[in-house]
Amino acid sequence: MAESEYVFPAPERFIVGTVGLPGDRSFYLQAKDADRVVTAAVEKEQVELLGERINELLDMVRSRSADGYMIPAGPDPADADNANLEMPVDPEFRVGTMSLGWDTRRRHLEIECSAISFGQDDEDSQSPVLRVVLSAEAAREFARRADQVVNAGRADCPFCSLPLDPGGHLCPRANGVPR
């Protein structure tokens, strides 16, 4: 039976990445420490929201503390992690819900990603959960990369804002004229 709880109290890496071409990409969260790599499949919208909420939470905590908990205002370019996902990309589960929290005493961000639940009432079965603890610096870098990965997809049509395929698309604002 697969592990049901993946805990990373101090991961070497916690990143988001994709596999596939723009328009047909699959998104993944990946946590790595010295002993293991855990990958979870996630939706593009979840990645976008997670990055935004991390920055919002860190900004809020920073503004409410006299020393700002020494939270950086933005990511440090020296911390940039633009390397690919660890291969092979074999997701343990698909993320359904995510939660964020700030531990004031330890001064770190906690992220919890739970698998999609299909309403099974079996008390013996436990949905997989990925728990990751990040420093404020690592969280800012994750949010930066999340934004970069999300925006690396297809360009938007200047008329209708729908994504453009490499061969163009039938634009609804132009009455179906190819763009």
Q: What would you call each of these model-derived segments?
A:
Residues 177-179:
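Short microdomains enriched in Cys/His and/or Lys/Arg
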Residues 40, 116-168:
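Mixed-charge, glycine-accented linear interaction segment located at domain edges/termini
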Residues 1-52, 56-60, 64:
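The feature marks the first
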Residues 1-21, 27, 68, 72-129:
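Intrinsic, low-complexity N-terminal interaction/targeting segments
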Residues 25-30, 50, 54, 109-113, ...:
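Short, structured motif recognition centered on aromatic/hydrophobic residues
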